[in-house]
């Protein structure tokens, strides 16, 4: 009986270890405007995840510096973290941004060099940023993306995502980011037809200017999409961090979006 208990405990521990938790967050103008106190708050919120995909990193030096500060703060929390930052996207000077990934090195290994999408960089204003990771002996590639605003019709660029699984047939793709578009939009149907699904359904993720009748979220923009034939969902969700603040105005100094997350294992 004791041997059976030990074996069960080992199997549970092994299963937990073999899972990966990814979090995606539009950190709104992530750069010099974020104070040390803000970066410390963000680090405390992210410390229990394995991989962080960040959108809206400022294209200038301040953006890269903020990511480095966040990684440094995470390294003070007990685990070793590394990070990578994209080149500025090829969009106009006003719209150009960077993306970033931060990950726990004892859990994940970065494979090869990350890259910005090349084939559709003219069709997609802020072309997505790819990075491949390995945990145990299996690999997956996160496609980090920030779409144009809703008024500019983000579906006109999201429509090119249906070509990406065929463009990268050997990669296990996860699409993560701020799509400025709900998962129910028909632009996602081609991906759904080949097995992709969203981690969140009908979940608003952007903050209003102020809460009305305890309703503080505005639009269903942020999500994570994955192929159900390649990934097993353990659990998924979002972090309503704004509830830790006295007002949305105060919460919005962190970001005008809430983070979304996905815990999974690979088939």
Task: Give the positions of each predicted feature.
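Hydrophobic h-region of N-terminal signal peptides that target proteins for export
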Residues: 9-17
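Beta-strand-turn-beta hairpins that frame and shape the catalytic cleft
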Residues: 18-22, 105-109, 123-145, 267
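His/acidic metal-ligating clusters that form di-metal
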Residues: 155-176
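Metal-dependent phosphoester-hydrolase catalytic domains
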Residues: 60, 166-172, 181-267
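Solvent-exposed loop/turn segments at secondary-structure junctions
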Residues: 27-32, 57-61, 88-93, 107-109, ...
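N-terminal, active-site-proximal structural segment of metallo-dependent hydrolase catalytic domains
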Residues: 2, 16-99, 155, 159, ...
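Sec-dependent signal peptide recognition
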Residues: 2-9
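Structural recognition of the beta-strand scaffold that forms the well-ordered cores
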Residues: 21-24, 50-56, 83-85, 100-101, ...
């Amino acid at each position: 009986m004791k041997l059976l208990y030990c074996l069960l405990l080992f199997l549970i521990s092994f299963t937990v270890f073999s899972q990966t938790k990814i979090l995606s967050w539009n950190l709104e103008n992530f750069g010099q405007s974020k104070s040390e106190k803000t970066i410390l708050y963000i680090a405390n919120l992210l410390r229990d995840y394995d991989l962080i995909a960040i959108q809206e990193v400022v294209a200038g030096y301040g953006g890269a510096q903020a990511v480095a500060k966040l990684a440094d703060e995470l390294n003070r929390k007990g685990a070793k973290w590394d990070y990578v930052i994209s080149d500025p996207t090829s969009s106009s000077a006003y719209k150009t941004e960077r993306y970033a990934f931060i990950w726990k090195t004892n859990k994940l290994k970065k494979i090869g060099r990350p890259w910005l999408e090349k084939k559709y960089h003219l069709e997609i204003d802020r072309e997505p940023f790819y990075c491949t990771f390995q945990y145990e002996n299996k690999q997956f590639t996160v496609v980090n993306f920030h779409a144009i605003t809703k008024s500019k019709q983000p579906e006109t660029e999201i429509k090119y995502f249906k070509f990406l699984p065929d463009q990268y047939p050997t990669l296990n793709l996860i699409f993560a980011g701020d799509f400025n578009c709900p998962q129910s939009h028909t632009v996602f149907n081609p991906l759904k037809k080949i097995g992709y699904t969203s981690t969140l359904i009908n979940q608003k993720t952007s903050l209003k200017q102020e809460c009305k009748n305890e309703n503080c979220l505005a639009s269903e923009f942020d999500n994570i999409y994955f192929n159900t034939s390649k990934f097993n969902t353990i659990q998924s969700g979002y972090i309503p961090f704004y509830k830790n603040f006295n007002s949305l105005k105060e919460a919005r100094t962190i970001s005008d979006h809430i983070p979304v997350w996905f815990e999974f294992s690979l088939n």
